[in-house]
Amino acid sequence: FIFPISTAAEKNYNKKPALMWFDATANFKRLSYPDSIDYYLDKIKKLGFTHTILDVRPICGEVLYKSQYAPQMTEWNGFHRPDFDFVGYFITKAHQLGLQIHASFNVFVGGHNFYDRGIIYTTHPEWASVVYTPDKGILPITELKNKYSAMINPILPDYQEYILNIFIEFISKYPAIDGIILDRARYDGIMADFSNYSRLKFEEYIGQKIENFPNDIYEWQKDSKGNFYPKEGKHFLKWIEWRAKNIYDFMSLAKEKVKSVNKNISFGVYTGAWYPSYYEVGVNFASKNYDPSKEYKWATSEYKNFGFRELLDLFTVGNYYSTISIEDYLKNHPMIKNETDFKFQQGTWYCVEGSCKNLKKILDGYPFYGGILA
């Protein structure tokens, strides 16, 4: 399985870059031999791609190289990879072909719930995000077996130190890498994170104790059809704002640490393209010049201060829609529910063309790469 990313419109480019993403686990066996790496890199070069994105830290928190901080993934689904410098070979071959190569890290995740595998199952269960569910109350995310990615609470200081050390180690180990891209640098969803630590840090942020937690954030209720929905509490909007600030602060710190090792390396981020509901994961990837409070009820007037597009050298999004054009979308108005969404969404944001047009607006002219799954 290969995840290609095609480019959206940009300004001041003679030739638009085109990125091809190689997922770690989907391609674990396929890319376990140098001649296979040669074959696929040669192929994407002939197809006109300019960049390859190599996933080096999948969701279980293992990495695809030898590390003093993270366990190395040497086996997946019963297949054991031969012992060679996978990342080093990929970098060398890509550069021989004139391709840029960027390494992708899944950031705030450390386990695979379908396999009970990963660092939050083995060494750091305390890092697991605590989620507030409609039917089971508050519990660790590792107990939600319908959710494959076991996410981590983004604000834990010891985890932030851990993941930043991984970035620094990787860039030092592979100085020829052209850039890194942060993936899953977010909360799991609207249900995260409701740990005691998050409560205390949020109380510090608003300068008062929460009388009724978690219901002062939101309370699960049922609508007329019997479906659960989060009824907003008195602190809901500040909670949404605070989560966006947390992710912004981490992005700022991560960039600082990365650039301290190599000032010329590209610092990039991948997100979903569905901005109207992406607040659910605590991410404001817009430009600071865009004020979402003028369009969306979930945004405070301060929310715009935590737009992080200006921090990035490279920004890529997933436009994962089966409807391509706005014209086709308007014929049927399909309801769309993306991986991070709590409920179904509707509007021209939820087709490939529409999302790209809307992204241009909120990014204030900054370039982005619009992605498709193939």
Give the residues covered by each predicted segment.
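An active-site-proximal structural segment forming one wall of the substrate-binding cleft
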Residues: 40-49, 93, 151-186, 305
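Aromatic- and acidic-residue-enriched segments that line the glycan-binding/catalytic groove
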Residues: 64-77, 109-145, 182-226, 280-293
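Catalytic domains of carbohydrate-active enzymes, especially glycoside hydrolases
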Residues: 35-62, 175-178, 305-317
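Aromatic-lined carbohydrate-binding/catalytic grooves of carbohydrate-active enzymes
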Residues: 47-83, 330-333
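Active-site clefts of carbohydrate-active enzymes
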Residues: 224-236, 265-287, 319, 326-347, ...
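Substrate-binding cleft/loops of secretory-pathway carbohydrate-active enzymes
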Residues: 110-113, 118, 181, 189-191, ...
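The substrate-binding groove and active-site-proximal loops of carbohydrate-active enzymes
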Residues: 22-31, 69-84, 145-164, 233-248, ...
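Active-site-adjacent "subsite" loops/lids of carbohydrate-active enzymes
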Residues: 12-34, 102-174, 224-237
